[in-house]
Amino acid sequence: MKRYYITDRKAVGGFRPLLEIIRDQMHLGVDFIQIREKDITARELFEFTLAVLEVRENEMRKRLPIKILVNSRADVALATGADGVHLPSNAPEETLPGLVVFRSCHTLEEIKASRADFVTFGPVFESPGKGEPAGLEALKAACQLGKRVYALGGVNWENAAECMHAGAEGIAGIRLFQDPAL
């Protein structure tokens, strides 16, 4: 089961604690880290991405490669040497040579139209502020469309196996990786 960690510094008290969580998740074998700090400047995003890449460089001697993705900003991903970008569902479809591309999808139609390398699909389960959950049957249908799908939204360690059974390549989340209670 592949794991896709989406960051939220506000939930953990800032950049310094977030870097510690990122380091811990690298040691725990996370496969992707999406830097999703939407409210910071391009300069701050650039600098934080470089800090995450430095942590990865220091930790890679001990682990398999971990892909670092920048939320919405292909320019920052390219400028920092990050591995890819995560695009929201409303972003224009584009080809970004040299970058791994994830796209948020909330409907089967969005998945069918996507040219991304991977998609996150959800919310699969109940998740605060994310609307009506799609459910496992919709996830199963999404996974049958020939895309590499990561289940998102309300996923926890107890229901992760159900997502994998539905055909997901992996699981994605914020609280899943930042909240020890999950």
Show where each model-derived region lies.
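Conserved N-terminal beta1-alpha1 strand-loop-helix module at the mouth
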Residues: M1-F118, P133-A134, A141, L145-V149, ...
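A short acidic, helix-capping loop that chelates divalent metal ions and anchors anionic groups
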Residues: A77, F125-K130
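Conserved, surface-exposed functional patches that form binding/active-site neighborhoods
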Residues: G122
